[in-house]
Amino acid sequence: NIMKKQFVIGAGLVATVAAALVGCATGPSSPPAAKAPTDAEIVAIMKASFKDSPSARLTRLDQSPLQQACTEASRTGKPLDDKLREQLQAAAMASVKYPTDGKYLGDWKRGEAIAQNGRGLQFSDAPGATAGGNCYACHQIDKAEIAHGNIGPTLWNYGKNRGQTEPILKYTWTRIWNTHAYNACVNMPRFG
């Protein structure tokens, strides 16, 4: 008899808790979410939050056709169609300016300093100030540097592993100048 009472009380408690939970799940909840802002509204907010300066123009916020296509591909989850991707990559390849003297390599110490430097193209910079590459933000280049990113592939021993033939040097130059020549929607910025 006592066990029956305990079972009935337990079952009643479970039923009460279940009813309360169902009420929470189906009852009024928080107010409906606000309508998501449009792309135009987002761009207007971004532009209003930046100052135009000689070293950092507001036009930098205007997307190129490549950026527009890649933004749309990212938003929809649909990759670029082959024809558009090929057109965008061909335009990127055409933008590359190779060294007129044919020298792809320079002072490696100066190159290391540029790779380490993340400064540049900020509104507070003097017009024409040299910008750094900030390569270490995404790549490992030297094993001695422990503060490096891993978004991009390691570049440790890049030249040693690949050699310094004309095709490799030209490929590397192109990758740095405008990496979109090889991958339209890559995250690496253009440095040319």
Q: What would you call each of these model-derived segments?
A:
Residues 2-13:
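Bacterial N-terminal signal peptides that target proteins for export
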Residues 4, 18-121, 175:
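Post-cleavage N-terminal segment of exported redox proteins
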Residues 13, 87-90, 150-151:
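A short alpha-helix capping/helix-coil boundary motif
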Residues 15-23, 143-146:
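Residue-level signal for alpha-helical transmembrane segments in multi-pass membrane proteins
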Residues 36-37, 41-42, 49-53, 57, ...:
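Extracytoplasmic electron-transfer domains, predominantly the class I c-type cytochrome c fold
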Residues 101, 127-129, 190-192:
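A glycine-rich, coil/turn loop motif that links secondary-structure elements
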Residues 123-134:
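Local sequence-structure signature of Cys/Sec-based thiol-disulfide redox active-site neighborhoods
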